[in-house]
Amino acid sequence: MNPGTTNFVHGFPFVAISLGLIYKKRPVLGVIYNPFLDYLYTGIKGHGSHLSKNKNPPQKLPLSTPRPLPSLSQALIAVEWGSDRSQTVAGSKAESFLRLAGDPNHTSPVKGGRMAHSLRSMGSAALNFSMVAQGGMDMYWYVIAHLMFAPLYEGLLCAGK
């Protein structure tokens, strides 16, 4: 999972160290740490997820009760361009992001547009997932341009079923 290497090189403080533990083919533990902000996200199967900020006691996630999300037009969505900027990958992502953010009712409409409230790119997949867990973002729109690798990505993300 992208920890925000480019962010680190540029001194942008959205960087993470992320670890996941799978036991008997099941995710049981996840840890994401942002050393610049001193935020530690933890998730332990059967014990929930927590955020510890600046050495303070852990807070249960999400930090606030999630509000109902009736449509994408009210959603704050995390997206990432990634490091593969080939025509195939960048083109797939650009098309997906355009449909996600585009206005289908504009005088120059975006075909298939869903008019999401806003898209954000933090530069770290690990922190995007953390912000969703925290309640700071509504979802992470993860585009896999090469679908033949989808099972591999599932394992890398410690995804459960």
Model-derived segments and their meaning:
Residues 1-161:
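IMPase-like, lithium-sensitive Mg2+-dependent phosphomonoesterase catalytic core
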